[in-house]
């Protein structure tokens, strides 16, 4: 019998999951850092968010965290008319 994988329903249901290709773990990191909505990321730098995440979480952020934060900031600042080519994690590597 296989173990069921633990699912983070709160992170999955958060507004951050409206961002295309947003990893669930990064949504969880943002929630743990005290952010509750996408608009709160406007004007922030990805590096400062990453530092806040490191301070607020016991987990070590993965390699996809910084590109995902850059994508989230871009989406928050351009939600009404984003460039589709930039709504991809690979565009932020």
Where are these regions (language model features)?
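C-terminal extensions
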Residues: 1-93
